[in-house]
Each structure stands twice: as C-alpha cells, then as structure tokens.
Design a protein with these regions (language model features):
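Metal- or metallocofactor-binding catalytic centers and their adjacent structured scaffolds
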Residues: 19-26, 42, 54-56, 60-128
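Short Pro/Gly-enriched beta-strand edge/turn motifs at strand-loop
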Residues: 30-38, 219
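Metal-dependent enolase-superfamily TIM-barrel catalytic cores that perform enediolate-based chemistry
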Residues: 133-244
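N-terminal export signals
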Residues: 1-14
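Flexible C-terminal active-site loop/helix
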Residues: 20, 24-33, 49, 57, ...
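Catalytic alpha/beta core domains of metabolic enzymes, predominantly
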Residues: 232-324
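Hydrophobic faces of well-ordered beta-strands that scaffold small-molecule active sites
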Residues: 61-63, 145-151, 170-174, 196-200, ...
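Conserved, mostly hydrophobic/aromatic
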Residues: 52, 58, 117, 130, ...
Length: 358
C-alpha cells in the first residue's frame, strides 16, 4: 500500500533495544461505488472507510473498518476510538485473547473500529506463522461455496446492466423492501433463471405481506430470505418463522456472539459480517455456535476493499452460503486478495488474510 495513505494518523509505539511492540496506524479512505447502492431505507454513492496497519518488527498486518450508514459509525468515530488504543503495551502479538479483550474494553459498540484491528492482528499473526487463516482453522479451501452477486433496488436499465456484470456468478442476491419488489424479480427472470436469494433489509413491516412475498419468492427459485422484517418485531418474526416455507436468515437482528442464541428459534440461520461481529475472532466463534445449534451459516460483507472481504473469506469453507462481493462493487480497491472463479470463492495460498497492496 502506498505509504502516503498512512501519513499523519497513527498511534506510534516506543521501540526499545531488542524488543518489538505492536504499532498501529490508520487513515480515512472513501470507497467509490461503481453504481449507486439502493436499499429499502437509503441510497449512497460511496462508503466511508478507515484503513489500518499493524506493525510488529518487520511484519505488517492490514485491516479496515467499513461504515455503511446503518452501523452508526463514522470515520471520525473510528479514528477517535483507534486513537485511544495503546497497543504498545503488548510485546507478544500471539496473546490474541488478551489483546482483543483489551480493545473491546476501551469503549462499548464501535464494532467496525474493533474489527479493523482484529483483522490486522489476524493478518499479522498469519504472516508470522506463514499460513493463511483457513489453514490455521483447519478448513479446506475446496469447500468454499459459490458467492452471490448483489443487485440493489434500481431502474430497469441499471438492473439489466448489473445482470451483465453478474454473468460469471451462479447465485444472485436481490435487495428488496419497496413496493416494486415483484417487478424487480420479473425483470431478473426475463434475463436469467439462476437461483436468487433475497435481502429485504427489514423492509416488510406486515407479517402477512412478508409471508405472501416469501411464498411467491419460493416459486421464483429463491433459496432464502434475509431479515424480512424489522429486527425489533420479534413476535411477528416468530409468527413468520413458524409459517414460512423458505429459510429465514438473521442479518440486522444479529451483531455479536450472544445474538446467535437469541436468533435461535426465530430464524433458520445467521449472516455473519466482520464489521458487526468485531472481526474474525468472534465471527469464527459465531459460526461454530450456529453449527452446534443446527442453524445455517452465511458469511457476508459490507462494501469493502479486498482486505476485509478476503478476511471474511477465510471463514467461507465453514459456511453454507457466501455473499462476498463487496470489493467488486467499488471502483478504487487497494488490495489484491480472494478471487471469484466460475462464481466460486478461490482462496489465495498467501499467509494471513491473503492480501497484498496494489
């Protein structure tokens, strides 16, 4: 990565003879979207981001915090949080639990900010060990699933253009939650019969309407529906879960590890995102717990560079479904990392999270 990106925004650590300490640096960065990203509740043309480096001796780990509006974090809040961290107290980066517990204790919430350091620390440790994290976790890269390609709420012309871009992908992810949901699916079905999955982004506030849509979507070769109703509507979600003929996946309802048990009985599966889970460490624990509860597991992302997307991809051999196309939606990526080959995730045989700066 260009050194200039990290000029002037850091928490330098003192160096002592014969001793290496963790050194954190960070810099705001704006992700430019190829198309306006239209969801049920908002629209945007860029996503604020903070890029992070964590140094230990000659090793550098990369991380990032991506902040779509609904997370409630900003570049300013992330930088304020990172400025509070004193990682120079740690001379052994392998004290992972202790370091992450310290980071989590500095302030509540700030999940994306915490994730940025967690990702950088995992990248750093993997590089020191000379292994990618999927191998450290004992996972087989051949088991990585196909990933979906996201098509947001948009005009017919833009939707058809996005379908051309999605040609290599086996599964399409459709953003819904507005009055023209069925028309969007009809446009897609006029072009392709590939399986779809639907993310309603909490857009259906009527349980009866949600059930009607789910039954209609089943006829449209839909695999599952994410977050059909507002996360606060727990009783209505329970009603819907009892009646729906498609799997229902928790997204906004789910943030961190304790939420997995809360989702059990209300949803059939969970969508894990590093920016919500505070990073790779807790995301892995969430996936293991969901498996133990016989729930489906999905790994997703925000609009992110290949840094965070490749970090999330390390989990992909452990999941049923993946939605890891956030790096493909931006025009100014900073890294080379995981690839999509014939619609399937291909994990690089590089240490850490598998990325190199462009």
């Amino acid at each position: 990565m260009a050194p200039s990106l990290f000029t002037g925004c850091s928490t330098p650590a003192p160096r002592t003879a014969g001793s290496d300490r963790l050194e954190l640096s960070f810099k705001p960065y704006d992700l430019k979207l190829k198309h306006a990203f239209n969801l049920a509740k908002n629209s945007r043309t860029h996503t604020p981001d903070v890029q992070v480096q964590l140094r230990y001796g000659d090793y550098i780990g990369y991380g990032e915090a991506s902040m779509p509006p609904y997370l409630g974090e900003t570049q300013e809040s992330v930088c304020r949080f990172l400025e509070q961290l004193d990682l120079s107290q740690f001379t052994d980066p392998f004290r992972l639990e202790e370091i992450l517990d310290y980071i989590d204790s500095v302030a509540p919430d700030n999940r994306a900010a915490k994730a940025s350091v967690d990702i950088a620390l995992h990248d750093l440790l993997g590089k020191i060990m000379g292994q990618p994290w999927y191998r450290i976790w004992g996972l087989s890269p051949e088991k990585a699933p196909a990933t979906s390609f996201t098509i947001g709420i948009d005009t017919e012309e833009v939707v058809r253009q996005k379908l051309k871009e999605a040609a290599p992908y086996r599964i399409l992810k459709i953003k819904m939650g507005l009055d023209n949901d069925k028309e969007l699916v009809r446009i897609i079905r006029s072009e392709t019969d590939r399986p779809i999955c639907v993310d309603a982004n909490q857009g259906w506030s009527s349980k009866e309407y949600a059930l009607e849509m789910i039954e209609w979507l089943k006829e449209q070769n839909c695999l599952f529906v994410e977050q059909p109703m507002p996360k606060e509507m727990v009783d209505e979600q329970a009603w819907l879960h009892e009646r729906a003929s498609l799997p229902l996946i928790a997204d906004e309802f789910l943030q961190r590890l304790p939420d997995v048990r809360r989702a059990y009985g209300l949803y059939d599966g969970i969508n894990i995102k590093l920016m919500k889970s505070t990073g790779m460490h807790e995301a892995y624990q969430m996936a293991i717990l969901a498996r133990a509860l016989d729930m489906k597991v999905m790994v997703g992302c925000m609009t992110e560079t290949s840094c965070a997307v490749s970090a999330a991809a390390q989990l992909s051999p452990l999941v049923d479904w993946a939605d890891l196309d956030g790096n493909l939606l931006i025009a100014n990526d900073l890294f080379d990392g995981m690839k999509i080959v014939d619609g399937k995730i291909s994990l690089p045989d590089r240490p850490g999270i598998g990325v190199v700066p462009l």
